[in-house]
């Protein structure tokens, strides 16, 4: 029981070390690094594999070949948010800016996408982009 309480204490202390929205980003990076990307890389068949880069969908072996790049990015993001590394600013916001661009372009290129859906999705991802850009002082590790 003491070990569980000690673990909860560590998790609680870690949670309060950064803003709640940054914790969500941190835990998303952990999920992508340790759960989704290993599944995607090792278990997902090449025929159904897809990766999005700057709004363009890569499929098959091109997707499989670029998965390690996503893995590295999310792994570095998880480590950077965990330790609040100074190099996370501006790179975290730059990466999210790439996601903003990707969401806009992907919606335009997608047969079911529209200018409205592109604008809405890009606007949604602009929120964490701006928040990360304005968080320079938080990255002090």
Which residues fall in each region the model found?
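Topology signature of small-to-medium multi-pass alpha-helical membrane proteins
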Residues: 2-141
